[in-house]
């Protein structure tokens, strides 16, 4: 599993939630307190729950299964695409097409059309067509490319979703839940954690926070995939797997975007005083006069 530290979380601003007026009462257990009208996320819980999520995605990849990275908000688009490619998985970073999972057969027809247009653009067939027709086909190709490029080689439903902002990607989350596909998600203070299988409480808006989580999850996937490859080789060529000594890892050349396995996250041996870390001005829960009323109303629904 990929390791993550309290220092990394703090430097990335993972502890900053939304304004106190924009919150979901179901996130109460993950909130440490409030400062200047902003909820502060309990990073002790973020560390613990990230470790669980990291282990899960690593195990999924180790079984040769597929992870789909999802993040269509502007600040998440680049990180989602880069990290998914780096660990050899798939992504959606522009727009989630309704029915992408639940209407998989139809989506695959669109993917097939994209591949056909890509071939036409490279094999010389465009040169045989009228200019207006080429412009029309190119417009169609670019539209499909924008929405489906990250799943062009995904030949079956994914086995797990990694999501940035479960509110923004609620359609993807609902489709996954309907099909029984586990969801790992970065969940901010305005989200509903009950819709997610593996909750990672944290800031889902800050670019540094998004990049941190996406890169660490990609590391875990890469490590799991490496174990899957190693297991396949051992079962095929070695009679006694216990005698096999690992010789190499997936590349460590960051310049070329290759994933590097990391050590398993060590358990937190001592409690970190959040008040000391965050300084003065943090009020613990409840932080608003209407909070208990809101929470009670939410529980009755």
UniProtKB/Swiss-Prot annotation:
Designated name of the protein: Small ribosomal subunit protein uS2
Recorded superkingdom: Bacteria
Keywords: Ribonucleoprotein, Ribosomal protein
Family annotation (InterPro entries): Ribosomal_uS2, Ribosomal_uS2_bac/mit/plastid, Ribosomal_uS2_CS, Ribosomal_uS2_flav_dom_sf
Gene that encodes it: rpsB
SUPFAM superfamilies given in the database record: Ribosomal protein S2 (SSF52313)
Signal peptide: none
Stretches the record annotates as Disordered: 282-301
